[in-house]
């Protein structure tokens, strides 16, 4: 309990300090000019609450208890017990918490520090959970509106400078590979795995290029983690509990290889394009397979859920308010908070690797280096 209170007090103090700094920045154009913003795109790994404000299902929202229990003491829409990776990246960059794009009453000046466009369930393909989420293409369109607003409010030159100095952080693609199997689709009977992955990665690199054409130069990207072996995946086949969901395994591996090659091509083709690619697959696999090395007791069992490994995603009544779920006693023992999403403790560890990890895990730049670039 004392540790939990200390974390909350420390986070509150950080928030107050950053908020005071933000007020100064709003009043002083020079400080705005010299501070790199953070723009976030992606899915539930990064969604800070955008899905709270769209007409969708409870299964792609997390605005209910016990989500948010650790740091915020109430649900925020983040799919974790506390903070997500972008929250920690913002802290390390001395930025305020990056607000969801759809959150009401955001002052325009706050956008100078960045915006979070991510949406739980989103994919790089428009058809992934269509009508229920904000897909990557729509997230890009929302960014374009913010870019226009910044140029209008700050002036064309200053707005362009905010965009060019900003870091653009992405995690997307996993839902594109899971979605066909949640709908019993016959998709892969009519298209090869490789062609499908080409579509996903192609959509991602197209968005990177469009952000580049708008002035963006610094990109942080996570490859796809081993979610074929997450608690939810380990219980899909009830006759083979703890077996990874093999149909997705090949897609994930192919995705990560093609994403790396795509980024290398962009780096060659686009002058000034710089990127930090985090090997999320490796960093998460290491923690799943050897949790005690990283301070966890459970690497493949969720803190919140039901059934074997708490792998059925009923956390907080996600699949219906009448459905029961179990909640662990000590969330810091767990890598996964719910059957698919990490605890705050795990998110912090991953964020640290993205921020200042060595080149074999985040490269050719890390985010700290990107933020320091003029």
From Swiss-Prot:
Keywords: Ethylene signaling pathway, Glycoprotein, Hydrolase, Lipid degradation, Lipid metabolism, Plant defense, Secreted, Signal. PROSITE patterns: LIPASE_GDSL_SER (PS01098). The keyword NADP does not apply. Disruption phenotype: In the resistant cv. Columbia (glip1-1 and glip1-2), confers susceptibility to A.brassicicola. GO terms for cellular component: extracellular space. Glycans are attached at residues 34, 184, 203, 330, 360. It comes from the Eukaryota. The active site is at 44 (nucleophile), 338 (charge relay system), 341 (charge relay system). Disulfide bonds: none annotated. Transmembrane segments: none annotated. One of its GO terms (molecular function) is lipase activity. Pfam families: Lipase_GDSL. Its main location: secreted. The keyword Secreted applies. Belongs to the 'GDSL' lipolytic enzyme family. This is GDSL esterase/lipase 1.
């Amino acid at each position: 309990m004392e540790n939990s209170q200390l974390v909350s007090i420390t986070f509150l103090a950080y928030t107050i300090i950053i908020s005071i700094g933000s007020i100064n920045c709003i009043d002083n154009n020079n400080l705005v000019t010299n501070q790199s913003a953070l723009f976030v795109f992606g899915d539930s790994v990064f969604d800070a609450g955008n899905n709270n404000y769209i007409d969708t299902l409870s299964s792609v929202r997390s605005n209910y208890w016990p989500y948010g229990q650790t740091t915020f003491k109430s649900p925020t829409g983040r799919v974790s017990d506390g903070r997500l990776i972008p929250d920690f990246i913002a802290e390390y960059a001395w930025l305020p918490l990056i607000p969801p794009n759809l959150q009401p009453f955001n002052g325009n000046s706050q956008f100078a520090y960045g915006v979070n466009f991510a949406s739980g369930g989103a994919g790089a393909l428009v058809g992934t959970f269509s009508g229920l989420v904000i897909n990557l293409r729509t997230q890009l369109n929302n960014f374009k509106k913010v870019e226009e607003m910044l140029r209008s409010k700050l002036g064309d030159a200053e707005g362009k400078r905010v965009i060019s100095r900003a870091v653009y952080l992405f995690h997307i693609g996993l839902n594109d590979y899971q979605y066909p199997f949640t709908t019993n689709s016959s998709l892969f009977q009519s298209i090869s795995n490789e062609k499908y992955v080409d579509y996903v990665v192609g959509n991602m690199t197209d968005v990177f290029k469009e952000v580049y054409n708008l002035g963006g130069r610094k990109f942080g990207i996570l490859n796809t983690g081993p979610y074929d072996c997450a608690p939810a995946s380990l219980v899909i086949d009830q006759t083979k509990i703890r077996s990874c969901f093999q149909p997705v395994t090949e897609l994930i591996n192919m995705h990560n290889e093609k994403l790396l090659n795509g980024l290398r091509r962009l780096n060659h083709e686009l002058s000034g394009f710089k990127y930090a690619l985090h090997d999320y697959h490796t960093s998460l696999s290491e923690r799943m397979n050897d949790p005690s090395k990283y301070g966890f007791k459970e690497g493949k069992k969720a803190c919140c859920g039901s059934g074997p490994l708490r792998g059925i995603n009923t956390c907080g009544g996600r699949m219906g308010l009448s459905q029961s779920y179990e909640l662990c006693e000590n969330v810091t023992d767990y890598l996964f908070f719910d059957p698919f999403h990490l605890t705050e403790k795990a998110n912090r560890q991953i964020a640290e690797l993205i921020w200042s990890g060595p080149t074999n895990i985040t490269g050719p730049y890390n985010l700290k280096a990107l933020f320091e670039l003029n």
